[in-house]
């Protein structure tokens, strides 16, 4: 392993502007699940919280081999929303500089999930969050880690060969006649 310096995220702005920890984000999730209240105190008015959790636009194709019972897939003010086994899931994921996170909550179940990883080359964060939801809902076990890994492996299977081909083609190009 090689330690990398922590870099500033100022240049990517809102894309990765939350620098936080699990303890603080857990408080944020509790606030989301309790209509803007935290520890019995109204921090953000419920109409404001509700507005962020309403659908503002439809997102892509809802049909999925992995989740064939999905009925909607929308986006609100910063939150993706979809149904999963009869409940509305609200989520947002993101990442930068080698970190990827997933925040999910299901108001009907009073369930919030945070997954923080220090990798961005796979979908472990999504697999783990879905595994937790299934266990919480007492759904039959599915090995999402294996499912998502196979999808990742299939998607990246030809990467090394493609890079080698690109390098070979670049190396075969005419060289400049004068020194650079």
What are these regions (language model features)?
Residues 3-180:
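Catalytic loop of the DD-peptidase/beta-lactamase superfamily, centered on the K-T-G motif
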């Amino acid at each position: 392993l090689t330690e990398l310096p922590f870099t500033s995220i100022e240049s990517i702005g809102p894309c990765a502007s939350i620098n936080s920890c699990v303890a603080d984000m857990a408080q944020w999730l509790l606030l989301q699940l309790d209509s803007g209240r935290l520890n019995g105190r109204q921090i953000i008015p419920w109409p404001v919280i509700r507005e962020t959790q309403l659908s503002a636009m439809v997102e892509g194709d809802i049909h999925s081999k992995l989740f064939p019972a999905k009925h909607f897939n929308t986006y609100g003010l910063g939150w993706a929303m979809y149904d999963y086994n009869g409940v509305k899931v609200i989520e947002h994921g993101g990442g930068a500089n080698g970190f990827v996170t997933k925040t999910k909550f299901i108001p009907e179940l009073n369930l919030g999930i945070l997954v923080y990883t220090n990798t961005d080359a796979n979908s472990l964060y999504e697999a783990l969050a879905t595994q937790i939801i299934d266990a919480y809902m007492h759904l039959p076990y599915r090995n999402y880690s294996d499912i998502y890994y196979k999808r990742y492996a299939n998607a990246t299977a030809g990467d090394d060969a493609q890079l080698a081909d690109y390098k070979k083609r670049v190396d075969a190009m005419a060289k400049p006649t004068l020194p650079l």
